[in-house]
């Protein structure tokens, strides 16, 4: 089973984004090993238990919090080591992003994606993007969704103290992932055929995958917010490490119906795209 780690970016800005790193079976151990190597770039082994708890993207990049006073070269090397997991083991990074201002000011806000909160809309896009990715790992047929159990995935979301946000995320998941899908009289209600029957929340302190997706989501949002693409900085170099693995979630019908609110890194993102038969839309299913 694939492990899909999800996190939102808390960086202030006009874009609400939820990102996911998918770790295929057999690769988690390599991610943990690289995580350990990254820690060793910053602290002596006998200091780790006392000085290190977790990697926070903003703090690590800016030299704040637990990383205050640590040499920039060491911090940047740690980031490169962490992101090398994306490059070396070909982990996909899937994200959903929406324009907060456009969505908030729109008269369609309440009906859009079935919710009004931009971050919840970004989560919906991201989760559907993971489903689209899972379906594309094996052949599909036009008449129905073909499910391959080797491409099942488990969603592990960074836990939050925002009770209302957590409630909305749980509700969104239950709307997308129908209960008892194989015995449901309306199979079209299920849009997450490859998802585990439950979504879990993890503590980032003890969850390495959440720390990795936090890093990717942070640099993804910086990339989306950047206006002058001709001016490059260190953040661009870090983004380039996992850029080949980046997938903008474009589920249908959301992508076509609400394209003006969705933010994408694709060069031709302004163009409306035709509906794919492999997308995580309402459709029948075959195993």
Regions found by a protein language model. Name each.
Residues 1-287:
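Phosphate-ester processing/binding pockets and catalytic centers
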């Amino acid at each position: 089973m694939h492990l899909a780690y999800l996190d939102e970016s808390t960086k202030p800005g006009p874009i609400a984004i939820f990102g996911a790193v998918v770790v295929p079976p057999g690769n988690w151990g390599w991610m943990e090993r690289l995580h350990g190597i990254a820690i060793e770039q910053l602290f002596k082994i006998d200091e780790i238990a006392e000085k290190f708890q977790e990697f926070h993207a903003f703090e690590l990049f800016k030299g704040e919090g637990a990383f205050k006073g640590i040499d920039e070269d060491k911090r940047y090397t740690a980031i490169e080591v962490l992101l090398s997991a994306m490059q070396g083991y070909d982990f996909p990074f899937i994200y959903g992003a929406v324009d907060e201002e456009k969505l908030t000011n729109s008269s369609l806000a309440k009906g859009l994606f079935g919710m009004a909160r931009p971050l919840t809309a970004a989560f919906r896009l991201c989760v559907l993007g993971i489903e689209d990715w899972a379906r594309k790992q094996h052949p599909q047929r036009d008449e129905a969704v073909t499910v391959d159990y080797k491409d099942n995935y488990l969603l592990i979301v960074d836990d939050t103290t925002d009770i209302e946000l957590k409630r909305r995320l749980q509700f969104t998941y239950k709307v997308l992932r129908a209960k008892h899908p194989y015995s449901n009289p309306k199979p079209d209600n299920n849009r997450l055929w490859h998802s585990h029957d439950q979504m879990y929340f993890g503590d980032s302190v003890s969850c390495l995958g959440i720390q990795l997706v936090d890093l990717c989501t942070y640099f993804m949002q910086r990339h989306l917010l950047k206006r002058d693409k001709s001016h490059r900085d260190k953040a661009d170099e870090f983004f380039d490490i996992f850029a080949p693995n980046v997938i903008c979630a474009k589920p249908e019908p959301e992508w076509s119906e609400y394209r003006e609110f969705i933010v994408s890194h694709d060069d031709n993102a302004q163009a409306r795209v035709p509906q794919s038969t492999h997308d995580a839309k309402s459709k029948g299913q075959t195993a």
